[in-house]
Amino acid sequence: MSNTAFPAATIVGYPRVGRFRELKKAQEAFWKGKATLQELQDTAADVQRTYFERVTAAGLKADNYSIPATFSYYDQVLDVVRLFTLVPERLAEAKDARGLLDLPGYFALARGTETLPPLEMTKWFDTNYHYLVPEIGAGTEIKLNLEAIDEQLEVAKQAGVKVRPQIVGPLTLLLGAKAEQGSAEDFSPVDRLDEFVAAYAQVLEQLAERGVEWVQLDEPGLTVDRADNAKVAELAERTYGALAAGEKRPQILVTSPYGSLRENLPALLGTGIEALHLDLVHGVYSKAELESVSAAGVHLVAGVVNGRNVWRADVRAALKTLEALPGASEGAVSVSSSTSLQHVPHDLALEDPAEVPVDGLAFADQKVAEIALLARGLAEGEAAVEPELKAADEALARFAADPRKHNDEIRARAAAVTPEDFDRPTIDVRRAAQADLNLPKLPTTTIGSFPQTAEIRRHRAEARAGKISAEELNGFLRDEIASVIKLQEELGLDVLVHGEAERNDMVQYFAENFDGFATTRHGWVQSYGSRCTRPSILFGDVKRHGEGLRGEAFTVPWSSHAQSLSEKPVKGMLTGPVTILAWSFVRDDQPRRETANQVALALADEIADLEEAGIRIIQVDEPALRELLPLRRDEQPQYLDWSVNSFRLATSAVKDSTQIHTHLCYSEFNEIIDSINALNADVTSIEAARSHMELLADIPESFVSGLGPGVWDIHSPRVPSQEEIESLLKAAIGYGTIADLWVNPDCGLKTRDYEETKQSLRHLVDATKAIRASL
């Protein structure tokens, strides 16, 4: 084992899709058969080389392992599935002739094929990133395959960069996995920990043979409350004690992003690992805990630059924090991001200062520069970096004085909210008032969006470029809405949607119509696989655009047009306050509760205008409700209180005859089922197809809302058969009363194409008719 010192400045991850989404485009071309595997790999290498160039230009060094090998073709957890060939029996045909996962097989697990359903996907801790959930059984074979790591090492070698491989650690892997179908009821993937520790030890040995001197093992799973925290701490001590005992291995950095290690901190410190990363932004550590790191002789990698938000760091304050850390004066502290920078866009320099408040912002490349500056200040003293500190102070002062940040009328309105503003009559009263909707048993509907075709994107791009007028764009969009309504009528759906052709993104669309937001041109962030979003920047007080405190309606013209084309009810479609916050970069100068209530009141104004226009069913989507749930149980009640209340503030002023729907996806719901119930919606649709309706077992009899468990997994290109949907419906009926069930896809259809959509919806409607006939 080498004794190469850990670098003074580092990051624990970086955006992987490319500054201009080069990887996304190459992935999708490969999946469509328009690019070869070699062309995809060439693009991947280009993305990695650009990464090396950007971070070294920002201040990291190419020769000291400060740069992690952070690239992934799809997902970092799926990378470990490939590393160990963790293929469940039901997906065995994804393996190649060697019994390993090559890239096509890797993608098959992620996306499914005509014959293979994909792995389940869920949220990565409390972020907006999604990971593929490994399925591990008692007999799942472990077979090493370092091809992906070797590919990254070779690209780095050719670029003259010494990288440290970045691998999801064994505890996070197993704690985040699920038991393979057919496993014994009492089996858990963690039961096989010792076998996996041995497999990881083999990986470390092979990395040492390749000349690797540092490796990064990511253990965010140790910052989460578990059923038995003490037991997890014992497992952490056992795991890393065994890995550190290896005679032939790289030095080990363990990272702990997203929260606090708590009882896992002393467990790790006694194992013999060389370096430990602590998230000092989202985690809370006492002076004694920080002193214990230094006392154990473990190098502290201090995550002081926020890896999850886009605000410029107060580098002067951060430097003082670093200087006060035990061991800092002896060189036992390095400067890092709090988390991987995969959660923020690539480069603020790509944005127009007239459109975004650049004085207050830092994207990935700027955060790397902040880290390098702090490391220099820590090593050389504050005076050595005073010019840079002064420039940062001045930028933050300009941002604080920005008049767009504060509106006294908005603040007064939010402060005047009373408890009555959060309440609606009982569900029985509302159902009686909504009976004249005359919906059948098992009403069929979709979640909201329809495919965003190339033609739609072309028209929007031409309007932005001034090639067509706003009137021409609106005329095209009205025709597109008419086409979507006609298709739904032909398919026989019961409750229709207008398809959201006018929206580029379910949060950005609202940001573009609300005061207090800025939107970016190139601020892309990976959500999963090739799916990227452009989170908006919420930096000021919020209301709808337009004169007065209420502003002007912006969804009403589209919904009214759609409703005029059908006798069936057409849903008004809004994104809820929690999701708008979760999928934006949110101001950090006031409590989230206050910001959420401002957004909720703006949405309440829009809902009132939809009602006035005759829209009887209004859906307020909250797919991110679970996402923001704190990782530690003692911090969760406060969040659930304000998040539920913000939804109720947005929706509680409606008439009893107006049916409020909500939609949740990408989540493990069992922990918050009571809070979902407390939303007090009339109908709740949830993602359920990939989990085969398993989550319905957690829904109590006291659940008051109608329920639409998804019967079609829209995150995969495969078309479910009618029989498959019937099977899921029968399973759903087994969990609840037929009168309360709705039939719908898992999520919106924006990312699907029309051929898949038509076939799948036809099967959905036919399956529903067959089930109705059998009742």
State what each model feature region is.
Residues 1-775:
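Domain-level signal for soluble alpha/beta catalytic cores
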